Regions:
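Conserved ABC ATPase signature
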Residues: 126-130, 134
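Conserved ABC transporter NBD signature motif
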Residues: 57-68
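A short, proline-enriched helix->beta-strand linker immediately N-terminal to the Walker B motif
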Residues: 145-149
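Short coil-to-helix segment of the ABC ATPase nucleotide-binding domain corresponding to the Q-loop/switch region
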Residues: 86-93
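Conserved ABC ATPase "signature" region
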Residues: 104-122, 174
Length: 255
C-alpha cells in the first residue's frame, strides 16, 4: 500500500503550519522527514495517521494493505507509551485484545514479535525492569503485532542515549532487511535520517513546505561501508536546515 499526500495545508488559528505538501510514500521504503523546530513535522505525521484532518488537501491510501493487517497505520512514539502494570507481553497483547484476539492465537503473535525485536527473554518483565532501549523495542513489537502496512514513527529514538540509539538503528535496519516494511519517520537527528532513510524530506521553516527531497541510493545493508558518502549527505541536509533556521531568525529580527 502506497500513501499519497496531495496539497496538504493547515492552520491552527491564525498560524499557518503547513502549505502545499505533495509527497509519495512508496511501499517498502522508509521516508524520513526533517526540518526546523515548529515546521509541522509531527503535525504532518498526524495527518498521515488520520489523527487529525488537514484544512486543505488529502492523504490517499493507494492499493490494499496486507490481507492480515489489523491496523494499516500504526504509531511508535518517543515516550514508549507502555502501561507500567503490564509486562512486555502484556503491553503487546493490549493491541490484540482491541481486535478480539486472545488465547493461543495471541500468544503465537506475541512470541513472534518479541523474538523479532530480541525480547523473548524479557517476556514477563515490567517496564520498570527494562532499559530505555528495551522499552522502545516493546513499543516496536506492539506496533508489529497488528501487521501494519506503514509504521508512523515520531522521533522514536530521541529519548535514548547515543549508544542505545545506535543499537536501535541497527535493530531497525535488521528488521527492515527481513521484512521490507514501510515507514514514515519524523526525526530531528540527521545521522538517523541518512542511516535508515531511503529518502529524506526536508521541510522549510513555518509554514512547512517541502524544501527538498534527497534520495539516498546506497542500499540500507551497505550504509556502514559508505560512511564518508553518508557524512556528505548529512552535511548537505545540515546546510539546507541551517539556511531555513537563519531565514527564520532574520524574519523574527525584521518584525
Amino acid at each position: 500500500m502506497d500513501l499519497h499526500l496531495s496539497n496538504i495545508g493547515h492552520r491552527y488559528g491564525d498560524t499557518e503550519v503547513l502549505r502545499g505538501i505533495d509527497l509519495e510514500i512508496t511501499a517498502g521504503q522508509i521516508v524520513c522527514i526533517i526540518g526546523p523546530s515548529g515546521c509541522g513535522k509531527s503535525t504532518l505525521l498526524r495527518f498521515v495517521g488520520g489523527l487529525e484532518r488537514p484544512d486543505q488537501g488529502a492523504v490517499l491510501q493507494l492499493g490494499e494493505p496486507p490481507a492480515d493487517s489489523l491496523n494499516p497505520l500504526t504509531y511508535i512514539f518517543q515516550d514508549f507509551a507502555l502501561l507500567p502494570w503490564r509486562t512486555a507481553a502484556g503491553n503487546v497483547s493490549l493491541v490484540l485484545e482491541d481486535h478480539g484476539i486472545r488465547g493461543a492465537e495471541a500468544n503465537a503473535i506475541i512470541d513472534d514479535v518479541l523474538a523479532r525485536t530480541k525480547l523473548s527473554d524479557f517476556r514477563d518483565a515490567l517496564p520498570k525492569q527494562l532499559s530505555g532501549g528495551m522499552k522502545q523495542r516493546v513499543a516496536i513489537a506492539r506496533a508489529l503485532a497488528v501487521r501494519p502496512a506503514c509504521l508512523l514513527m515520531d522521533e522514536p529514538l530521541s529519548a535514548l542515549d547515543s549508544q542505545t540509539r545506535d543499537l536501535l538503528m541497527d535493530d531497525l535496519l535488521e528488521l527492515w532487511l527481513r521484512e521490507r516494511f514501510t515507514a514514515c519517520y519524523v526525526t530531528h537527528n540527521l545521522a538517523e535520517a541518512v542511516r535508515i532513510g531511503h529518502k529524506v524530506v526536508v521541510l522549510s521553516r513555518r509554514p512547512g513546505r517541502i524544501r527538498d527531497v534527497v534520495d539516498l541510493d546506497i542500499p540500507l545493508e551497505r550504509r556502514k561501508e559508505h560512511a564518508e558518502d553518508l557524512q556528505e549527505q548529512q552535511r548537505h541536509l545540515w546546510d539546507l536546515m541551517r539556511e531555513e533556521a537563519l531565514a527564520a531568525d532574520q524574519e523574527l529580527a525584521d518584525v
